[in-house]
C-alpha cells in the first residue's frame, strides 16, 4: 500500500468519523446518562455487567446511526445553514450511498448486540430503529420535532428495564417522562442557535414555535422534568443523595436560563452543552445513593 493510498484511506475514515459525530461526544453522553440511570433503577444499583457493556456500546453505535440518517435527510438543506454547511454530506465529501451503507453497517452491528439479550429487548430495539429513521423527517411535518426526539432519546430506558428485568414496569415510565421533558428543554436551546437559518430553509422547531416565549417554555419543561425525576426516585425509594442530585438539576436549570436570556448563539450553545453535567450529576448521585443506602 502506497503512502498516498494510506492518506486517502485515513482521510475517508476521518470523514466517516465526522459524519458519525465521533469527534463530538456530547450527544452520546446525553443519550448515555439516562440509559445508565435506567439500568441502575432496574437493577437496584447493581446492573449485570454484560447488559451494561452492551448498552454502552449500543448507545455509541445508535447515536452514530442517528447522526448519519439525520445528515442524509438534511443533506440538501444543511448547505444553506451556517453551522452545518461543512458537514461531509452537505459539502459533497461523502456520497449518499456511502452514508446509507455506513448507517446499515452500524445498524446491523447494534442489532447484533441486542440479539445477545432477551426477546422483549429485541422487539423494543426494532421500534427504536424505526423511530431513529423517522426523526429527521419530522422536522418537515411538525412544529415540535423536539417532542419526537424526546421519544427517540428516551427509548433506551424501557429497553434497559426490559434487559434487566424481562419486563417494563410502570415506574420505568417516570424516568422516560423525565428524560423526555429534559430532552425537549435542552434541544430547544439547541434549536435557538439555528432559528434564523431554519426559518429561511423551512425547517420547523420548538424554538420557532415558541417564539418570544421560548425561555418560558424551556422552564416549563425543566420543571416537569424535575417532577418526573423526583417521582422516579420516589418510586424506587431513593434517599438523600439522589435528592441532592435533583437540587443540582434545579441549580443547573437556573444557570441555563441565565445563559439563554440574551438568546445569543454562543450562550445558547453553552447552555445546551451544560446539560452533560446535569446528566452526569444525576447519574453519579443515583449511583452513590444506591451504594450508601
Swiss-Prot record:
A Gene Ontology BP annotation from the UniProt entry: ubiquinone biosynthetic process
Pfam families (UniProt xref): UbiA
Nucleotidyltransferase is among the record's keywords: no
Chief site of localization: membrane
Pathway info: Cofactor biosynthesis; ubiquinone biosynthesis
Similarity remark: Belongs to the UbiA prenyltransferase family.
Record protein name field: 4-hydroxybenzoate octaprenyltransferase
Organism of origin: Shewanella denitrificans (strain OS217 / ATCC BAA-1090 / DSM 15013)
Amino acid at each position: 500500500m502506497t503512502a498516498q493510498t494510506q492518506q486517502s484511506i485515513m482521510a475517508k475514515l476521518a470523514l466517516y468519523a465526522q459524519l458519525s459525530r465521533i469527534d463530538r461526544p456530547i450527544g452520546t453522553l446525553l443519550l448515555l446518562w439516562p440509559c445508565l440511570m435506567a439500568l441502575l433503577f432496574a437493577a437496584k444499583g447493581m446492573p449485570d455487567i454484560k447488559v451494561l457493556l452492551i448498552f454502552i456500546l449500543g448507545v455509541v453505535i445508535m447515536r452514530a446511526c442517528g447522526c448519519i440518517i439525520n445528515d442524509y435527510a438534511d443533506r440538501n438543506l444543511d448547505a444553506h445553514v451556517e453551522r452545518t454547511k461543512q458537514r461531509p454530506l452537505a459539502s459533497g465529501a461523502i456520497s449518499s450511498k456511502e452514508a446509507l451503507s455506513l448507517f446499515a453497517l452500524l445498524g446491523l452491528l447494534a442489532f447484533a448486540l441486542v440479539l445477545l439479550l432477551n426477546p422483549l429487548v429485541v422487539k423494543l430495539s426494532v421500534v427504536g430503529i424505526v423511530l431513529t429513521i423517522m426523526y429527521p423527517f419530522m422536522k418537515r411535518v411538525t412544529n415540535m420535532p423536539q417532542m419526537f426526539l424526546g421519544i427517540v432519546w428516551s427509548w433506551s430506558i424501557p429497553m434497559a428495564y426490559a434487559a434487566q428485568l424481562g419486563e417494563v414496569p410502570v415506574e420505568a415510565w417516570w424516568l422516560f417522562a423525565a428524560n423526555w421533558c429534559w430532552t425537549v428543554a435542552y434541544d430547544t436551546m439547541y434549536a435557538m442557535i439555528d432559528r434564523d437559518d431554519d426559518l429561511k430553509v423551512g425547517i420547523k422547531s420548538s424554538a420557532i414555535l415558541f417564539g418570544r416565549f421560548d425561555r418560558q417554555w424551556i422552564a416549563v419543561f425543566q420543571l416537569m422534568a424535575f417532577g418526573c425525576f423526583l417521582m422516579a426516585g420516589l418510586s424506587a425509594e431513593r434517599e438523600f443523595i439522589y435528592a441532592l442530585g435533583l437540587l443540582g438539576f434545579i441549580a443547573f436549570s437556573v444557570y441555563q436560563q441565565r445563559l439563554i436570556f440574551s438568546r445569543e448563539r454562543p450562550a445558547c450553545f453553552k447552555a445546551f452543552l451544560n446539560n452533560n453535567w446535569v446528566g452526569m450529576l444525576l447519574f453519579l448521585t443515583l449511583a452513590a445513593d444506591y451504594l450508601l443506602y
